[in-house]
């Protein structure tokens, strides 16, 4: 975890100068998912440190929404996944939780990264549980489906590198809640900051 003094020194103004550009997201989802851990997710005056992510690899991935393209209602909602990387994909899960993702890779790949957990950085207090889970991420940062398809390289919603932050220790395991996905349920596509108190689930299952 970042030292308290270091966290307190971070400001949104400083983060804005270290915004991650769209080109950075033009890579495979599993690569981006791993490297987003330790970066900041910023929305307006609030920011959290990404501590847990999941990668979704396209239409062949049995857990990915990209597999629904061309199948009725899924087409409109999930078409954003086939656009260029660096764009937000926000959807409602089980009629309750807004889920925030970033599209990755070149257009046509259908890949995305789900932000599963953040730790408070700016404007979120000090409780590590505030962003512990994807539904809490969006609640903490004030995100919902109005932010779907937003360009994360412009505007007040973006990812940023944290200056002088050491690379966090990364743990890898299967994604959560995808038992329906057959063999894909056991693929090691969840990445988290090892032993961080803000992670939604620290074990591999």
Q: Where are the model-predicted features located?
A:
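Conserved, well-structured core segments that form or line functional sites
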Residues: 2-205
């Amino acid at each position: 975890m970042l030292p308290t003094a270091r966290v307190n020194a971070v400001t949104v103004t400083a983060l804005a100068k270290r915004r991650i550009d769209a080109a950075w997201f033009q890579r495979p989802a599993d690569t981006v998912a791993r490297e987003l851990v330790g970066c900041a997710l910023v929305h307006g005056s609030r920011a959290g440190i990404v501590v847990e992510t999941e990668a979704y690899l396209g239409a062949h991935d049995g857990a990915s929404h990209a597999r629904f393209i061309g199948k009725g209602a899924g087409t409109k909602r999930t078409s954003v996944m086939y656009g260029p990387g660096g764009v937000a994909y926000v959807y409602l899960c089980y009629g309750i939780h807004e889920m925030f993702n970033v599209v990755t890779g070149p257009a046509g790949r259908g890949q995305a990264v789900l932000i599963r957990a953040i730790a408070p950085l700016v404007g979120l207090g000090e409780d590590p549980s505030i962003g512990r889970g994807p539904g809490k991420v969006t609640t903490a940062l004030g995100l919902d489906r109005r932010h779907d398809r937003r360009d994360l390289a412009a505007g007040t919603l973006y990812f940023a590198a944290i200056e002088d932050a050491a690379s966090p220790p990364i743990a890898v395991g299967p994604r959560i809640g995808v038992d329906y996905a057959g063999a894909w349920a056991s693929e090691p596509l969840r990445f988290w900051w090892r032993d961080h108190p803000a992670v939604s689930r620290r074990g591999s299952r």
